[in-house]
């Protein structure tokens, strides 16, 4: 997953903060887990996504509602 600019990063952060369950990202290269409800981990993972190194990041959410929120955000960003 990649972000193209700070506006997308802020919008993504807003989506993450609206999630009610656990949300995490995993680097497929290193296996590192990022807790996306933790501000420090958000900054680290978003830095990767903004720098073009987010292709190896996979996102997961505990609840279907959160999965839907994140998927809707991703679809909207691809359409923009």
Stretch-by-stretch model annotation:
Residues 6, 36, 61-64:
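Generic alpha-helical scaffold signal
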Residues 36-37, 70:
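Short, well-ordered secondary-structure micro-motifs
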Residues 2-28, 33, 40-41, 47-49:
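Compact, glycine-rich, soluble single-domain proteins
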